[in-house]
Regions:
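Pyridoxal 5′-phosphate
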Residues: 1-340
């Protein structure tokens, strides 16, 4: 990105040579993403992130029936709530893999149902890119959402796949960028950073590393949590057909998730209690409430996220600290334990 700021500083829409150089860099990233998801480059536009991409699709269907799942990101749930109506065709918006529990939704079945009725299907693929192979044509999607920071790129950059012929209404108007589909000056350094991350995915076939090394680490931690910590349970179904290989969400009876997070953070172990977009909200995770229906389970849950940079030593470090932390919290908890 530093190189891009120095070499591709010009407005990419300009006709002069520096502008052409900047646009070439943008198109390079577009082609990389298209190749990784089996799309045509002209079907992809760049945005400021997944939330903008999600809102763009849903606003296209303002006043129409919009059907989503309770597991969706807030940018889908809240936009759909504000903009849905009763007009047809219907938009179905279902993520492929949930960001809090990692589990897959039956996207192909939903797409088939949508298209049989002349409706449209959008999917937030943000969490899945780079973790598993993706093919928007095989998934039969009309729209798909991506975000650079989920693959090691910069924050503030995303992309939206729009199938040829699918309805589209720009969220931002006032410029001819992206063939009049998003009017604003290009964030060339950010898009270049996204491109560098995508090239890394392609060159290293990261989905293969996630399917082997990362899955092994995740499953080992899951096994040890259940074996060594009384009152623990998993909110993530394990298995290649069930969930992403890098996410593990677990609950610990009579231990508050935020307290677990703070104790682990003091030990240099970074976990989360839900979506980062909802951090600071004392309400239980809407995802875990939808899955379990139990506020105590939701409040006592934490999410572990693995990457190829992790090792079995990291699993050992977690298990050297976590049982003692849970035991300490359970002893001072006012919540009665169901298991002893």
């Amino acid at each position: 990105m530093r190189e891009a700021e120095q070499k591709f500083f010009a407005n990419a829409s300009a006709l002069h040579t520096p502008g052409h150089l900047a646009m070439n860099k943008i198109e390079e990233t577009r082609e990389l993403l298209a190749e990784l998801i089996n799309a045509d480059p002209e079907e992809i536009i760049f945005t400021s992130g997944a939330s903008e991409s999600n809102n763009t699709v849903i606003r296209t269907f303002e006043g129409h029936e919009i059907i989503t799942s309770p597991l969706e990101h807030h940018s889908v749930i809240e936009a759909a709530k504000a903009l849905k109506g009763k007009k047809k065709p219907t938009l179905y918006s279902y993520m492929f893999a949930n960001n809090e529990i990692g589990e897959f939704l039956p996207l192909k079945d939903i797409a088939k149902k949508a298209h049989e009725n002349g409706d449209f299907i959008h999917s937030d693929l943000t969490q899945a890119l780079g973790k598993i192979p993706l093919d928007v044509k095989a998934l039969d999607l009309d729209y798909a959402t991506f975000s650079a920071h989920k693959v090691g790129g910069p924050v503030g950059v995303g992309a939206l796949y729009i199938r040829k012929g699918a309805p589209f209404k720009p969220l931002i108007i006032g410029g001819n960028q992206e063939k009049h589909r998003r009017g604003t000056t290009y964030n060339t350094p950010g898009i270049a950073g996204f491109g560098a991350a995508l090239k890394y995915l392609k060159d290293h076939k990261t989905w293969e590393i996630y399917d082997t090394k990362v899955r092994e680490l995740r499953d080992e931690l899951a096994k040890r949590i259940l074996a060594e910590i009384p009152g623990s349970s998993l909110n993530t179904e394990l298995g290649r057909e069930k969930s992403l290989p890098n996410i593990l969400n677990a609950s610990f009876e009579a231990a508050e998730g935020e307290s677990i997070q703070l104790y682990l953070d003091a030990e240099g172990i970074v976990v989360s209690t839900g979506s980062a977009c909802a951090s600071g909200d004392i309400k239980p995770s809407h995802v875990l409430m939808a899955k379990t229906g139990d506020a105590e389970v939701a409040h006592s849950s934490i999410r572990f996220s693995f990457s190829p940079d992790n090792s079995m030593e990291d699993v050992e470090k977690v298990m050297a600290k976590l049982p003692g932390i849970i035991d300490r919290l359970q002893k001072i908890s006012t919540i009665e334990r169901k298991t002893k």
